[in-house]
Amino acid sequence: MSFADITPDLKAAMPELRGRLLANEGLAPLTWFRVGGPAQVLFTPADADDLAYFLKHLPAELPVYVIGVGSNLIVRDGGVPGVVIRLAPRAFGEVKVDGDIVAAGTAALDKRVAEVAASANLTGLEFLFGIPGTIGGALRMNAGANGGETKDILVEATAIDRQGVTHHFTNADMNFTYRASGADPSLIFTAARFRGKPSDAEAIRGRMAEVQAHRETAQPIREKTGGSTFKNPPGHSAWRLVDAAGCRGLKVGGAQVSEMHCNFLINTGNATADDIETLGETVRERVEATSGIALQWEIKRIGLKAR
């Protein structure tokens, strides 16, 4: 499927734009599942000022979606109408340390932020080492693993709104809850500051090694997957509910519930986005039928289904 090419109109309305605009650009290569249709417009801003300029001049009726490394994302097969903004590491991926503060652009990999903190002998950020995403996603969903969450370490987040205005948010402003933040969904996060605590370098590295060992042995990290599919309901583990419903190894087309970890869906090689989403919905139905619990998606789904 392809969309009307609106990039000439956008370029004409934004003569000072420095970033890259592409029409009908495939998104599958930008996601871990490797599925999905194109973006009507894919915009890669040159820097935060360029992003603000773009948003200020973008027609209000055009929907906007933001992606990082696509690790927690299903792009539907019909593609994404409107604008998809991809924050590239070269412009939004810097990580630096000042005292006990770790400052990171939102395209920085969570793992990289943990490594930089460890190099500065700062503890508290080790949990990020086991999260296969970027800081932007961590802010949006209060990403967490291995006993830590983004809310535990955030000092301040910087974001740009649809009018191109920059805002700064404290930890309290973010209104974090389990795997979510209360920040306006239209905000695009560009940077964050985290606080660590001075500690022993060897101990920090040891904890990071434990995190990596757990991922290697318990999660299908070599597969085409989107990470944890469903949020853990209060008092329950999603994977246990999925397993109890008899869904371990369940398949729909080229999509399968991982045999290694039941809360991971994988693309076995030829899955469509619809295969993966249908499998997820089938799992939700079976879990609710057996336990009475309605699982909530943790993976973000965007775009249109194929016609």
Swiss-Prot record:
One of its GO terms (biological process) is cell division. NCBIfam families: murB, PRK13905.1. Pathway: Cell wall biogenesis; peptidoglycan biosynthesis. One of its GO terms (cellular component) is cytosol. The keyword Plastid does not apply. This is UDP-N-acetylenolpyruvoylglucosamine reductase. It is found in: Cytoplasm. It catalyses: UDP-N-acetyl-alpha-D-muramate + NADP(+) = UDP-N-acetyl-3-O-(1-carboxyvinyl)-alpha-D-glucosamine + NADPH + H(+). Cell wall formation. It comes from Bradyrhizobium sp. (strain BTAi1 / ATCC BAA-1182). Its cofactor is FAD. GO terms for molecular function: FAD binding; UDP-N-acetylmuramate dehydrogenase activity. Disulfide bonds: none annotated.
